[in-house]
């Protein structure tokens, strides 16, 4: 008999041996910033990103209660030469908030946004049946989706974790998984693109040239300057947004663990149970493929107003408890890998697959039905904290199977080649999802701007009807040779699919040393993937924050 063990506890215990845990610096060595605004709560805090790879010691953190407090902080920072970095739930990987080594001496103040969490339904949306909701940037996605559900509304797709702030989600054009199924008509007030495409208006703290100071200003979706703010990478400070919402949908989610990867990711035209066949049938698919295993965990969502006879009804989110706790042999394998026994990666992959199959049966969660958010949210904060790379491959809808087939073949071949040399750079899953692009026409607002820096921003030079295949590869932090392996994956995707863009919140620009370090990707490849819209967006962000209050060294390097 095995005893469930928290995967977070496994990672924490193992990461200590790998040097990934850290302790606070001496608090006495960090004086309070000069003339800090009275009335704004603040304290010193240690920062770490989701995987624990980026951390900042003993940094001053402000906790504004209102948008006016953010304005006050911005003008103070401008006078004193500080940078402000908004933070929500810290469920991200890339150095968009702070860079490695940031500390008290760096003249950086983190701004905890979670008191900016008010929500109000503001009326019907532009399309019959849609609604609008005004929400603070610090509100959590789980809270927002619950608020909408109580009012009879929801979203077509959303990121799987509920512990994400609305502002953070919009800053990096966060997404779920959804394209129109065959014959499906888009519901009013919804999008198949990123959540940034749901914004009708937003309020940001920007420079007011007339007043010679920072001030809160509202931007309508039709304002050309709004294009750069819709997915701003943290280079701006949004305090509030008004979003579209659609009618509340009921979803069914069927999990399958019986389709071989060779069949699911077969060459286009092969027939059978291909990834594309499931996508055509329901429009909502996710594949989770553990390394060195033959059958992915395939989730297939479908719109289902009435409960199918075989489906178990659910009334809350997070219905896969086995994703948060694992049998002790699996926990032991993860710990031993982090302790240096990297050759156990194949055993860990097989153990994770076995735990998934057993968990789906034991919890009767292979066929679920309920309100949309209860099927869309399925990643708890207690899940295993791993490093993840991320890319969006933009292709015509007819090209999805070609993308997943080519990627699966390349990934498998390289994984085997590394293993033949005694190297095991990947010990986590591959995750594959598909979305539409950010079509501003879905807002039903005349002159609506597309999110200029969204990975899903349409490219006028590409054909209409494109979708994005999102590809992530996961591995435990600090796994040897992972940087080199991810560099090969990245180069393959950019070479094989010119429409590839990076997923801002995750790992990219790899060298053998790790992520966010390849100068060619940072300086040339990423900007080129956005075409002329890149320079226009960067210029707009610079105009709105000429004193560079809302930036960090990584963003200064990237957005230039």
Predicted regions: what is each one?
Residues 199-412, 416-428, 433-434:
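C-terminal substrate-binding/cap subdomain adjacent to the FAD-binding core in PCMH-type
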Residues 3, 22-53:
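C-terminal segment of N-terminal export signals and the immediately downstream linker at the start
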Residues 52-157, 287:
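Glycine-rich N-terminal segment of FAD-binding domains in flavoprotein oxidoreductases
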Residues 1-18:
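N-terminal secretory signal peptides and thylakoid transit peptides that target proteins
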Residues 83-85, 152-160, 212-217, 251, ...:
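Short secondary-structure capping/junction motifs at helix and strand boundaries
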Residues 102, 367-560:
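Conserved glycine-rich FAD pyrophosphate-binding loop
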Residues 94-118, 176-209, 237-241:
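Structural signature of FAD isoalloxazine-binding scaffolds in flavoprotein oxidoreductases
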């Amino acid at each position: 008999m095995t005893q469930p063990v928290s995967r977070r506890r496994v990672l924490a215990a193992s990461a200590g041996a790998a040097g990934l845990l850290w302790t606070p610096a001496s608090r006495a060595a960090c004086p309070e910033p000069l003339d800090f605004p009275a009335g704004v709560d603040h304290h010193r805090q240690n920062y770490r990103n989701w995987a624990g790879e980026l951390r900042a010691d003993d940094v001053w953190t402000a906790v504004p209660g209102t948008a006016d407090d953010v304005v006050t902080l911005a003008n103070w920072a401008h006078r004193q030469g500080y940078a402000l970095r908004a933070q929500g739930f810290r469920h991200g990987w890339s150095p968009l908030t702070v860079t490695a080594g940031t500390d008290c001496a760096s003249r950086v103040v983190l701004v905890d946004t979670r008191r900016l969490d008010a929500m109000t339904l503001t009326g019907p949306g532009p399309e019959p049946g849609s609604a609008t909701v005004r929400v603070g940037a610090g509100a959590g996605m789980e809270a927002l989706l619950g608020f909408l559900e109580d009012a009879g509304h929801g979203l077509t797709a959303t990121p799987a974790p509920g512990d994400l702030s609305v502002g953070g989600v919009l800053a990096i054009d966060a997404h779920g998984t959804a394209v129109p199924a065959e014959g499906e008509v888009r519901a009013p007030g919804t999008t198949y693109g990123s959540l940034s495409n749901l914004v009708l208006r937003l309020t940001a703290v920007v420079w007011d040239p007339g007043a010679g100071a920072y001030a809160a200003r509202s931007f309508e979706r039709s304002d050309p300057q709004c294009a750069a703010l819709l997915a701003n990478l943290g280079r701006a400070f949004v305090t509030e947004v008004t979003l579209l919402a659609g009618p509340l949908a009921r979803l069914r989610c069927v999990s399958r663990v019986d389709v071989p990867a060779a069949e699911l990711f077969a060459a286009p035209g092969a027939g059978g149970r291909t990834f594309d066949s499931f996508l055509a049938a329901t429009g909502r698919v996710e594949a989770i493929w553990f390394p060195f295993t033959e059958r992915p965990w395939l989730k297939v969502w479908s719109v289902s107003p009435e409960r199918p006879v075989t489906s178990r009804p659910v009334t809350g989110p997070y219905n896969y408890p086995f994703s948060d706790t694992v049998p002790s042999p699996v926990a032991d394998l993860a710990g031993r890998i982090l302790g240096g026994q990297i050759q156990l990666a194949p055993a860990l992959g097989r153990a994770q697959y076995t735990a998934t199959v057993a968990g789906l049966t034991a919890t009767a969660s292979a066929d679920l039905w309920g309100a949309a958010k209860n099927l869309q949210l399925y990643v708890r904060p207690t899940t295993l904290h791993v490093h993840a790379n991320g890319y969006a491959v933009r292709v015509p809808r007819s090209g999805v199977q070609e993308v997943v087939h080519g990627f699966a073949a390349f990934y498998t071949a390289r994984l085997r080649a590394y293993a033949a040399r005694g190297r095991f750079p990947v010990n986590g899953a591959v995750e594959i999802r598909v979305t539409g692009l950010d079509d501003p026409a879905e807002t039903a607002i005349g002159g609506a701007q597309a999110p200029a820096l969204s990975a899903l921003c349409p490219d006028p030079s590409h054909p209409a009807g494109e979708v994005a295949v999102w590809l992530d590869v996961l591995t435990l932090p600090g796994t040897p040779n992972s940087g080199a392996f991810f560099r090969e994956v990245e180069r393959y995707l950019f070479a094989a699919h010119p429409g590839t863009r990076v997923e801002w919140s995750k790992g990219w620009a790899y060298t053998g040393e790790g992520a966010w370090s390849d100068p060619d990707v940072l300086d040339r490849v990423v900007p080129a993937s956005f075409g002329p819209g890149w320079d226009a967006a960067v210029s707009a962000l610079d105009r709105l924050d000429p004193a560079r209050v809302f930036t960090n060294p990584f963003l200064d390097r990237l957005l230039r």
